[in-house]
């Protein structure tokens, strides 16, 4: 009677060859880009450009909250205040997280990264009505295409990259980010 199937030795040989092939493929794949500050700045730039375009097309005000290891986009939305002391309805504006389907929000960075933000003094006007310390975002994106001038620097050990928006709304990046974008 003939035996059907494979012997244990044949099966083990196939598993060994598959493992070697998988190892060779993994060694050929480049290191993850998430650890590269230039790649992260290019990602932030793409998100910023999308937010500016969306703000212009949909006529709404957006903002960006910057924290040491993440950034979050927000939308300024009008709310009706119920039960106001007066008989008339009152309106107030609140910042809510903005999460378009095309953007991964919020943008978390690996723990080894650190974000530094500097804005121009007086960039937000005379200081009345806008204050990042009072819950307002650090960067404003207005429907006319205006963006609060700022400089964002990402550091990952000795690796760093920056993005700067000037008073004319032009976006400039470090050479590391331009190569990635």
From Swiss-Prot:
One of its GO terms (cellular component) is plasma membrane. The chain crosses the membrane at residues 6-29. It is a single-pass membrane protein. It comes from the Bacteria. The modification N-methylphenylalanine is found at residue 6. Keywords: Cell inner membrane, Cell membrane, Membrane, Methylation, Protein transport, Transmembrane, Transmembrane helix, Transport. PROSITE patterns: PROKAR_NTER_METHYL. The keyword Transport applies. It is found in: Cell inner membrane. Pfam families: N_methyl. One of its GO terms (biological process) is protein secretion by the type II secretion system. Its main location: membrane. Residues 1-5 form a propeptide. InterPro entries: N_methyl_site (IPR012902), Pilin-like (IPR045584), T2SS_protein-GspH (IPR002416), TypeII_GspH (IPR049875). Type II secretion is composed of four main components: the outer membrane complex, the inner membrane complex, the cytoplasmic secretion ATPase and the periplasm-spanning pseudopilus. Interacts with core component OutG. Component of the type II secretion system required for the energy-dependent secretion of extracellular factors such as proteases and toxins from the periplasm. Part of the pseudopilus tip complex that is critical for the recognition and binding of secretion substrates. This is Type II secretion system protein H. It comes from Dickeya chrysanthemi. The lineage of its organism: Bacteria, Pseudomonadati, Pseudomonadota, Gammaproteobacteria, Enterobacterales. The gene is outH.
């Amino acid at each position: 009677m003939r035996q059907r199937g494979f012997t244990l030795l044949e099966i083990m040989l196939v598993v060994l060859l598959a493992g070697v092939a998988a190892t060779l493929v993994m060694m050929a794949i480049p290191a993850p880009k998430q650890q590269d500050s230039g790649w992260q700045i290019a990602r932030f730039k793409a998100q910023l450009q999308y937010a500016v375009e969306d703000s212009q097309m949909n006529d709404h005000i957006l903002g960006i909250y910057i924290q040491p290891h993440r950034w979050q986009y927000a939308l300024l939305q009008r709310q009706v205040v119920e039960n106001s002391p007066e008989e008339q309805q009152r309106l107030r504006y609140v910042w809510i997280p903005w999460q378009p389907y095309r953007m991964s929000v919020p943008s978390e960075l690996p723990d080894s990264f650190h974000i530094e933000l500097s804005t121009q003094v007086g960039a937000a006007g005379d200081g009345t009505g806008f204050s990042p310390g009072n819950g307002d975002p650090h960067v404003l994106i207005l429907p006319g295409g205006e963006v609060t001038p700022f400089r964002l620097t990402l550091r990952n050990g000795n690796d760093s990259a920056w993005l700067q928006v000037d008073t004319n709304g032009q976006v400039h990046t470090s050479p590391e980010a331009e190569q990635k974008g």
